[in-house]
Each structure stands twice: as C-alpha cells, then as structure tokens.
C-alpha cells in the first residue's frame, strides 16, 4: 500500500457521515465531550459560525459567542471524536465567507439576520 492509501483508510474510520450542512452565519449548538477528573460529560457550546476552513477530515468551524460581555471564539474540528453532536439552531443570512467583522461590533450590532429558505 502506498502512503496515501494508508492515510485515506485511517481518515475513513474517523469521518462522520451524519453531520448537518453547516453554513457561515448559522447559529449552532456543538456538544463537546469534556473530562472532569474521572467523569466525562457533554458540554454544549452555542454560537454563530464565523468561519469554515479546509475540507474533508480536516474541516474546522470557528464559533463565536458573547459570554459575560466578552467575545469567546472556539475552533472545532468537526470530525473529532470529542465532538458528540452538532445541531443547527437557526440559519443566518450573510454575504461573506468569513464574518471576522463581527469581532469589532458590540451588542445588537452582532446579530445576523435569519434565513428561512434553507432547512435546519
């Protein structure tokens, strides 16, 4: 076997087939599995997708939310075994591929209009 075939076979084991279609501007709830001591639990993280990068097994999404008045961004590798589930809460209507301009906005200016022509 060539190196590429070995890499593809390993990637195929971790590739998640049942993920929803995620677009930039969507509000998503990501279930992240965390370990506290010897216990594991799923912690939800909800926010707006401001960027999507790469493709295939290396696909990442950057999710931004405001927590106690401070903007928090997390980058999730969506095919990671630590991600238990991803649910689209609402669709956003945007005209950019990257929403980095939301970092400079405060309060109600960070809202994204809702899009109704795509299914959840």
UniProtKB/Swiss-Prot annotation:
It comes from the Bacteria. One of its GO terms (biological process) is translation. The keyword Ribosomal protein applies. One of its GO terms (cellular component) is cytosolic large ribosomal subunit. Keywords: Ribonucleoprotein, Ribosomal protein. Pfam families: Ribosomal_L19. One of its GO terms (molecular function) is structural constituent of ribosome. InterPro entries: Ribosomal_bL19, Ribosomal_bL19_CS, Ribosomal_bL19_sf, Translation_prot_SH3-like_sf. PANTHER family: LARGE RIBOSOMAL SUBUNIT PROTEIN BL19M, RIBOSOMAL PROTEIN L19. This protein is located at the 30S-50S ribosomal subunit interface and may play a role in the structure and function of the aminoacyl-tRNA binding site. Belongs to the bacterial ribosomal protein bL19 family. This is Large ribosomal subunit protein bL19. It comes from Acaryochloris marina (strain MBIC 11017). The gene is rplS.
């Amino acid at each position: 076997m060539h190196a590429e075939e070995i890499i593809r076979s390993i990637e195929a084991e971790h590739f998640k087939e049942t993920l929803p279609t995620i677009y930039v501007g969507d509000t998503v709830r990501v279930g992240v599995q965390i370990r506290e001591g010897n216990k594991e639990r799923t912690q939800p993280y909800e926010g707006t997708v401001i960027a999507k990068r790469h493709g295939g097994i290396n696909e990442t999404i950057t999710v931004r939310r405001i927590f106690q008045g401070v903007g928090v961004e997390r980058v999730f590798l969506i095919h990671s075994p630590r991600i238990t589930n991803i649910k689209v809460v609402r669709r956003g209507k945007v005209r950019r591929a990257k929403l980095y301009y939301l970092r400079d906005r405060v309060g109600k200016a960070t809202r994204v209009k809702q899009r109704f022509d795509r299914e959840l």
